[in-house]
Amino acid sequence: MLKSRIIPCLDVKDGRVVKGVNFVDLTDAGDPVEAAIRYDAAGADELCFLDITASSDDRPILLDVVRRTAEACFMPLTVGGGVRTLDDIRALLLAGADKASIMTAAVANRDFVREAAEKFGSQCVVVAIDAKQVRPGRWEIFTHGGRKPTGLDAVDYAREVVALGAGEILLTSMDRDGAKTGFDIPLTKAVTDAVNVPVIASGGVGTLDHLVEGVRDGGASAVLAASIFHFGEFTIAEAKLHMANCGLRMRLDGIV
């Protein structure tokens, strides 16, 4: 059985790490390269770097920041935001990213997922889903930083992109983002039950127990968090040890 992963997330706007609530009210949380170095030293399993306004600003991702981040740390790096073409993915991988996260472009053109998986391998292709509950048991996908409804059912869409070659799903509950009330477990479980690839649960972590719930109750392979780590509420080591003490398999070497 694979070990569960903890993934700090750097939401980057104008070259700075930011954190908000429900995708708005952004607060500065520091320099992305410095943050990456800290998380690498602390024993994070991976790092997620999301340029949160690249799609809505209709501009390319900040490759220089990606390159400097990748050079500074040794853990796997997933990068997303404004990834629209195969050339964008190639540029990210050449800049040092291990995986490219695609969202808006995948919604607009499903073939992009298939083409990316064929060109670079499924292991490089993460499809990000930002979902909001529209009624009990149904979640709709939103794009452009959570501003644009699509009418797409999140669970059906996850199933579809995995069939096309997505190697991982990054699943964010917009309702829970930054709220610190825990993951949307019904959403997470619905998606993990529907696909046979790893799912990263995102949106809502406020306590260490929430991390446990994402894996134990939601079925996630990895849990992503931002606020609790960026602002020093908990360390990566505290999170890993708590999850291990709750019976989850964790990589404990290298934690500080």
Curated annotation (Swiss-Prot):
Keywords associated with the record: Amino-acid biosynthesis, Cytoplasm, Histidine biosynthesis, Lyase
Subcellular location field: Cytoplasm
Family annotation (Gene3D superfamilies): Aldolase class I
Molecular function as annotated in GO: imidazoleglycerol-phosphate synthase activity; lyase activity
GO terms classed as biological process: L-histidine biosynthetic process
Major place of residence: cytoplasm
Domain of life: Bacteria
Coiled coil region boundaries: none
Entry EC number(s): 4.3.2.10
Disulfide feature: none
GO annotations of cellular component type: cytoplasm
Catalytic activity: 5-[(5-phospho-1-deoxy-D-ribulos-1-ylimino)methylamino]-1-(5-phospho-beta-D-ribosyl)imidazole-4-carboxamide + L-glutamine = D-erythro-1-(imidazol-4-yl)glycerol 3-phosphate + 5-amino-1-(5-phospho-beta-D-ribosyl)imidazole-4-carboxamide + L-glutamate + H(+)
Active site: D11, D130
Listed pathway(s): Amino-acid biosynthesis; L-histidine biosynthesis; L-histidine from 5-phospho-alpha-D-ribose 1-diphosphate: step 5/9
InterPro entries, alphabetized: Aldolase_TIM, His_biosynth, HisF, IGPS_HisA/HisF, RibuloseP-bd_barrel
A UniProt-annotated Pfam family: His_biosynth
Primary role: IGPS catalyzes the conversion of PRFAR and glutamine to IGP, AICAR and glutamate. The HisF subunit catalyzes the cyclization activity that produces IGP and AICAR from PRFAR using the ammonia provided by the HisH subunit.
Family assignment from sequence similarity: Belongs to the HisA/HisF family.
Quaternary assembly: Heterodimer of HisH and HisF.
PANTHER family named in the record: IMIDAZOLE GLYCEROL PHOSPHATE SYNTHASE HISHF, IMIDAZOLE GLYCEROL PHOSPHATE SYNTHASE SUBUNIT HISF/H IGP SYNTHASE SUBUNIT HISF/H
UniProt name for this protein: Imidazole glycerol phosphate synthase subunit HisF
Organism of derivation: Methylocella silvestris (strain DSM 15510 / CIP 108128 / LMG 27833 / NCIMB 13906 / BL2)
